[in-house]
From Swiss-Prot:
It catalyses: GTP + H2O = GDP + phosphate + H(+). It comes from Methanosarcina barkeri (strain Fusaro / DSM 804). GO terms for molecular function: GTP binding; GTPase activity; translation elongation factor activity. GTP hydrolase that promotes the GTP-dependent binding of aminoacyl-tRNA to the A-site of ribosomes during protein biosynthesis. Residues 146-149 are annotated as: G4. This is Elongation factor 1-alpha. The keyword Nucleotide-binding applies. Gene3D superfamilies: P-loop containing nucleotide triphosphate hydrolases, Translation factors.
Length: 422
């Protein structure tokens, strides 16, 4: 049963049309997660639309509109098992305007598979996705050099693409030697579960073996307790019940906790998960909990619960390292977009542009730049317009990452380097 196996969240990233959905469809199909009759139905539908090669991808693209356009939009959660783990696939779309989905999707992932099409090699989004997944704290990567059937399973072409991808990985601090590269054809299933006869020159692992070789990230239960509040309910006979996912630390009945930035504190009376009372909550648990003396007015979405002896940090200002993904013009000091961090969404002002960095190496390119534009990486000083909890990424990574949104798009992704507390 899947519950006995460790669970991993897997992001699938890469440039549009490089075969991500087909790849995920194939993984699930070969892992026995998709009934054969469903695949047959998709094949038939795809054939009628003249897109026969899309059959497996249709397992993932269950949204009608996407089928018509032939692309994947929202993040789809799919599940499959290997011998060792059970995986939830966080399928990250490839279109440019979907970088926000990538930010919310990738940050839930423990590992990523980068899909690069052999005929095209590295494209703009291949780079952006590698970079973003690194920014968002994904440290385990597997690279699938896909569509090998389209280059007649050429070892020479495979090596060229491996070389291209390795170059980018090195620039941002991955060690290419530690990362498995697998030549695949998701459509035909080469090297996904079984070694392919068409690549006799390839002696490495199959995709399934590479997935089994991933390491389970350690649960951050030794870090200070942090539970971002998603919502708070009033339940008759119990009182106010905040709900949220434990990001770090552990919480037991009887613990003294505080909700920041408001500062309301009390003793934990009960903890519930899946409608059952539990004695303690661990990282990853989605819980509801009741705290003595806390009323509906004391707690709201975006607050963070922690122990009173190590409360969540409330920033007067904080220093962030950001990557500007897109902006119609330029960003200057004084810019006040909305910051999305854990469950909070708060307008914050960039009060100072401290340094412009080379996005590839992290080296300082310019001190106190006058503006930032798409593609730039920078260190900036940020002032929230109202009290906000954020933690340095080195101390509590789960509460140190943020996305900057404005004009209906993701402007930048970033992480908090230091906090000046209120």
């Amino acid at each position: 049963m899947a519950a006995d196996k460790p669970h991993m969240n897997l992001a699938v990233i890469g440039h549009i049309d490089h075969g991500k959905s087909t790849f995920v469809g194939r993984l699930m199909y070969d892992a026995g997660a998709v009934p054969a009759h469903v695949i047959e139905k998709y094949k038939e539908e795809a054939k009628q639309k003249g897109k026969e090669s899309f059959a497996f991808a249709w397992v993932m693209d269950s949204l009608k509109e996407e089928r018509e356009r032939g692309i994947t939009i929202d993040i789809a959660h799919k599940r499959f098992d290997t011998d060792k783990y059970y995986f939830t696939v966080v399928d990250c779309p490839g279109h440019r305007d979907f970088v926000k989905n990538m930010i919310t999707g990738a940050s839930q992932a423990d590992a990523a598979v980068l899909v690069v099409a052999a005929p095209d090699g590295v494209m703009a989004q291949t780079k952006e996705h590698i970079f973003l997944s690194r920014t968002l704290g994904i440290n385990q990567l597997i690279v699938a050099i896909n569509k090998m059937d389209a280059v007649e399973y050429s070892e020479k072409r495979y090596k060229e693409v491996v070389e291209q991808v390795s170059g980018i990985l090195k620039m941002i601090g991955f060690k290419p030697g530690d990362i498995p590269f697998v030549p695949t054809s998701a459509f035909y299933g080469d090297n996904v579960v079984n070694h392919s006869e068409k690549t006799p020159w390839y002696k490495g692992v199959t995709m399934m073996e590479a997935l089994n070789n991933l390491k389970v990230p350690e649960k951050p239960s030794t870090l200070p307790l942090r539970i971002p509040v998603e919502d708070a309910y009033t339940i008759s006979g119990i009182g106010t019940v905040p709900v949220g996912r434990v990001e770090t630390g552990t919480m037991k009945k009887g613990d003294k906790v505080v909700f920041m930035p408001g500062g309301a504190a009390g003793e934990v009376k009960s903890i519930e998960m899946h409608h059952e009372e539990i004695p303690q909550a661990l990282p990853g648990d989605n819980i509801g909990w009741n705290v003595r003396g806390i009323g509906k007015a004391d707690v709201r979405r975006g607050d963070v619960c922690g122990h009173t002896d190590n409360p969540p940090k409330v920033a007067d200002t904080f220093v962030g390292q950001i990557v500007v993904l897109q902006h119609p013009s330029a960003i200057t000091a004084g810019y006040t977009p909305v910051f999305h961090a854990h469950t909070s969404q708060i307008a914050c002002q960039l009060i100072e542009l401290n340094k412009k960095l080379d996005p590839k190496s992290g080296q300082v390119k310019e001190e106190n730049p006058t503006f930032l534009k798409a593609g730039d990486a920078a260190i900036v000083t940020i002032k929230p317009t109202k009290p906000m909890v954020i933690e340095p990424v080195k101390e509590i990574p789960q509460l140190g990452r943020f996305a900057i949104r404005d004009m209906g798009m993701t402007i930048a992704a970033g992480m908090c380097m230091s906090v000046k507390q209120k």
